[in-house]
Amino acid sequence: MLIDNMRMSVTDFLIANWFLSIPFLILIVLYVRAFAKRGGQRISVHEATSLINKGAQIIDVRDSNEFESGHITGAKNIPNNDIERRSNEIISEKPIILTCALGQNSPSAGEKLQEQGFKDIYILSGGLTTWAETGLPLVTD
């Protein structure tokens, strides 16, 4: 009986310790928001195609072998390791869509570009895997 009385649900704990819970929850929300914008705004395939139709540039940050195996039409290949050195090849006045295989390497490239003053940076959520899964074409030039 004593053990049952000592058990406290998570909800009961949060309510009983609201003065600790609220700041902790605020910190979690702020952390998640900051992480979500790291390197650029995440966009869907649909949003990416809309931006591409409006003249956005596509930068594929995979290595050249991966790029040659299939990429979005009009994409420029600047591997993540070279992005700082070759940033002069990117037009700062146009929106930039960064792509990679799964959407996991693009944010680091985006951070590097942000450090160099680029503003309009977007990350293709799910990368080229998601692009291909939606039935959109990849070319091999």
Residues covered by each model-derived region:
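Short, surface-exposed ligand- or partner-binding patches at beta-edge/loop junctions that are enriched
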Residues: 99
